[in-house]
Amino acid sequence: MKKIVTLAGDGIGPEIMAAGLEVFDAVAQKINFDYEIEAKAFGGAGIDASGHPLPDDTLAAAKTADAILLAAIGSPQYDKAPVRPEQGLLAIRKELNLFANIRPVRIFDALRHLSPLKAERIAGVDFVVVRELTGGIYFGQHTLTENSACDINEYSASEIRRIMRKAFAIARGRSKKVTSIDKQNVLATSKLWRQIAEEVAKEYSDVTLEHQLVDSAAMVMITNPACFDVVVTENLFGDILSDESSVLPGTLGVMPSASHSESGPSLYEPIHGSAPDIAGKGIANPISMILSVAMMLRDSFGETAGAEMIEHAVNKTLTQGILTRDLGGLANTKQMTAAIIANL
């Protein structure tokens, strides 16, 4: 039996978590997948329960889980507080050594009109951004004085090698192309990044490697996003480019993500926030959460059939014109969830 720890969090988190688990249970019955759920407080809910966004019992449960589902964190009441929900996310990434953030970017045909790009620009877009999550300038030394400031960007060969291998492994199961993004013409870290990328490429002779400078890649992501298959880059560049890629579908409501460690549990979550303005109204779009469940089935448990079942059901539901308000429709959370289950 697989143990899944759920972190419903704040805002619309509990509502979309319930939707995700409802779909998960329906699929689990169809594929005979045996599991148990352990729900834990996290984010603002963790602060309310224990004074910390990542309570000790939540962390202990997460460390022994086979996978972790996170819905959403954040609440206006903590915006100016010394202890904030977002600190829990940074803490759990560090404690579980979640070094690889995986963000799929796919355009659903039924939602093409929502994209800010012309139809011909987004046709065929289906790529994955692989972002190194625990190294680089965010985790370097930061110095600030009255007249100067300094941030240290540091990467080791081993840190680069493991994220590269993750990207190449993902590409091997897709269209076998990796685009490594750096700033090799200026930065020493990028020179090492490119060197290690070339070394790892030799281990995956069936996968094509290309390099792009980050400024060029940012431009191509708008002018020709369909050219990408797997994009891999360091923490700062990945933070920016993954957010850029998230606007291509025209909505955050259909985008899941995963964060992987080397040997421990992975964490799956929507990329959108807690949307406190609509919390409790029953109108939140659950698709990002539901697709995060699909990612969990595929990546953590090897249940490709179950993952595809969910993805096909979501696509069919959207094609039928069943849309939540953020997508231009009238369906509420429960109606969208029920429609997806009916289409499994």
Swiss-Prot record:
Pathway: Amino-acid biosynthesis; L-leucine biosynthesis; L-leucine from 3-methyl-2-oxobutanoate: step 3/4. Signal peptide: none annotated. The record marks Y138, K183 as: Important for catalysis. NAD(+) binds at G273, S274, A275, P276, D277, I278, A279, G280, K281, G282, I283, A284, N285. One of its GO terms (biological process) is L-leucine biosynthetic process. Mg(2+) binds at D215, D239, D243. Substrate binds at R93, R103, R131, D215. GO terms for cellular component: cytosol. Its EC number is 1.1.1.85. It catalyses: (2R,3S)-3-isopropylmalate + NAD(+) = 4-methyl-2-oxopentanoate + CO2 + NADH. It is found in: Cytoplasm. Its cofactor is Mg(2+); Mn(2+). InterPro entries: IsoCit/isopropylmalate_DH_CS, IsoPropMal-DH-like_dom, Isopropylmalate_DH. The keyword Magnesium applies. Keywords: Amino-acid biosynthesis, Branched-chain amino acid biosynthesis, Cytoplasm, Leucine biosynthesis, Magnesium, Manganese, Metal-binding, NAD, Oxidoreductase. Catalyzes the oxidation of 3-carboxy-2-hydroxy-4-methylpentanoate (3-isopropylmalate) to 3-carboxy-4-methyl-2-oxopentanoate. The product decarboxylates to 4-methyl-2 oxopentanoate. Belongs to the isocitrate and isopropylmalate dehydrogenases family. LeuB type 1 subfamily. This is 3-isopropylmalate dehydrogenase. It comes from Streptococcus mutans serotype c (strain ATCC 700610 / UA159).
